[in-house]
Amino acid sequence: MIHTLETTVAGRKMKVDFGKTGMLSNAAIFMSYGDTVVMINANASKEPREGIDFFPLSVEYEERLYSVGKIPGGFIKREGKPSDKSILHARSIDRPLRPLFPKGYRNDVQIVNTVLSVEQDNLPEILAINGSSLALCLSSIPFTTPVAAVSVGLVDGEFIINPTVAQRENTILDLTVCATKERVMMVEAGGQEIDEETMYSAIMFGFEECKNIVAFQEEAVAKFGKTKNEPVLYKADEEVEKEVKSFAFDMIKEAMYIMDKDERNAQLDKVKEKISEEFSEKYEDKVADIAEVIYKTQKEIVRNMLLNEDRRPDGRAFDEVRPISCEVGILPRTHGTGLFTRGLTQVMTVATLGALGDVQILDGIAEEESKRYMHHYNFPSYSVGEVRPLRGPGRREIGHGALAERALEPLIPSESEFPYTIRLVSEVLSSNGSTSQASVCGSTLALLDAGVPIKRPAAGIAMGLITSEDLEKEKVITDIQGIEDFFGDMDFKVAGTEKGITSIQFDTKIKGLSNSCVKDALEGAKKARLHILGKIKECIPEPRKELSKYAPRTEIICIDPEKIRDVIGAGGKVINKIIADTNVKIEIKEDGKIFVTSNNEPEGVKKAISIIEGLTKEVVQGEIYLGKVTKTTNFGAFVEILPGKEGLVHISKLDFARVEKVEDVVSVGDEILVKVTDIDNQGRINLSRKDAIAKKEEEKDK
């Protein structure tokens, strides 16, 4: 039986069809918003997975290019691995849903979002979050708290829910808010230096609209939701928990109160060895339970320390940032480098400048086709002192890279101001909390060192949260380190300039944040951000005046757009010859702007520009040109005065004396001065060597 329910969001129809597709899935829905359609399938394994200590939730976001009427590029002509954007959208779906599953739930759960049709006014990723929540709520999987999501824009001082393409072009804020009917669960934001008060208001504005979508989901569940399965929840054996905790609590507490991380970890290893010696034989089949008890005991001690004793593991005040150091220019051959260290977190970012032709080409369902500025993030095993195989970037690396990229994007100069492609690579050298925000700081240093004229320096900070079980008591923490992130309830990342916020990402391990917590986190992040910006400015107060001598050089010339075809030539013959002869890269824009770039060959740039100017320059009657003889006939000589532009010097115009034979005066290949005496209606150019000589003699006499 097919069930249908509709509502209206921001003046557009949102509709769900349940039972129409995916008959063998636990729950399968067709969710539409305008002409955007996403199919969501939710399934779970019948039994918990053994031998794991985490919840195995898998969220997939599958883009189909047919959804926008495109055929994939390349030879294979089908969708390949997920794009970076697909991975980011999958992470955005995962983060608000994961905390709402029952604690101890170990069944495999998979949510597959397939984008089937896209109307660019209605973002499929927002629809997918709502659809994933609704599919889970309608299923028999033990998920009972609906989550809703909206996009919020800010145009001309007005907040807009789910802005259209035209509105997104003018918005200074790109905000996604996910919430239950009671609390905010997740926020993603990019903005053009938005002040804290405005950002808070925008989040609350989105929160209110989320409540309406939650009500829609609740109505759907009441009308056609399945009966929920009774979950089998993992819990450590009570006897094991009692004995291990009794034996080890004081030892673990003593270790957890050691401020130095290395010393603390070393002491914990010793405690774990003692626990193993004491219980390995008695509970040889309960190793996982023992590990769970140790983890829960550590968590209890750290949370009590923060919440009730007003003490942090490293002794800092709750609003104190770890010691900071900044360096630039540490790699001699790169275009710009920044080394940012905050406590035991250290990131080195390297900036590379390229020609505009080095942009990243995007083949996705969005309208955006290329990226001129990009940021990549690497997190090797040595950054946490571990040994594991080095692989390509995972979802976490892609997510952190995009977060730092978004933080700096509003500050990057326009193409006309700075005609270069910019790539930043952040290498995490040491990790003890908030490497993504350290990447923002390292990237700022690298850009300034590279001479990129960014609007203002940016910095990032991660705020944390500890709450009581009943959520009544809470404490916000500035600049969380690894242990506070691991045992805490929130990771609230805020990046921006002294003027305002450019990026936010926060998610939580609990059932959402209170409004006061959101406000306190924003204010605390501002204070910390200004402190860090001061340290950055002490190191390098402004962009370097000159680019690195190893960076490419780009010159811009403007031509009449009607002349572009003359520069390109038939089949690209002309432009390819210029590139081959001068060893440069050339980018031509539709408005007639031409960008000429060369690596360490300034003469090549000058030569290429000279050729292009010659190709596009108009011949002026009465002007004198230095031309080259290309052909001789019995009636005169043809002379090329500009690239591709020839004129005729009649035999009578070659010299003052009578000329019997053209070759007596000029030969093919000779360079001679000629004057343009006439351009006829057909564009034919008449030249005179005699008049050019006379004019030069006249100028000499003066």
From Swiss-Prot:
Domain of life: Bacteria
The protein's required cofactors: Mg(2+)
Localisation: Cytoplasm
Single GO BP term: RNA processing
Listed Pfam families: KH_1, PNPase, RNase_PH, RNase_PH_C, S1
Protein name: Polyribonucleotide nucleotidyltransferase
UniProt KW keywords: Cytoplasm, Magnesium, Metal-binding, Nucleotidyltransferase, RNA-binding, Transferase
PROSITE patterns, per database record: KH_TYPE_1, S1
S1 motif domain mapped to chain residues: 622-690
Role: Involved in mRNA degradation. Catalyzes the phosphorolysis of single-stranded polyribonucleotides processively in the 3'- to 5'-direction.
GO molecular function per UniProt: 3'-5'-RNA exonuclease activity; magnesium ion binding; polyribonucleotide nucleotidyltransferase activity; RNA binding
Residues given in the record as Mg(2+) binding sites: D485, D491
Uppermost EC category: transferase
Documented EC number(s): 2.7.7.8
Reactions the enzyme catalyzes: RNA(n+1) + phosphate = RNA(n) + a ribonucleoside 5'-diphosphate
Stretches assigned to the KH domain: 552-612
Cellular component GO terms held in the UniProt record: cytosol
Recorded family membership: Belongs to the polyribonucleotide nucleotidyltransferase family.
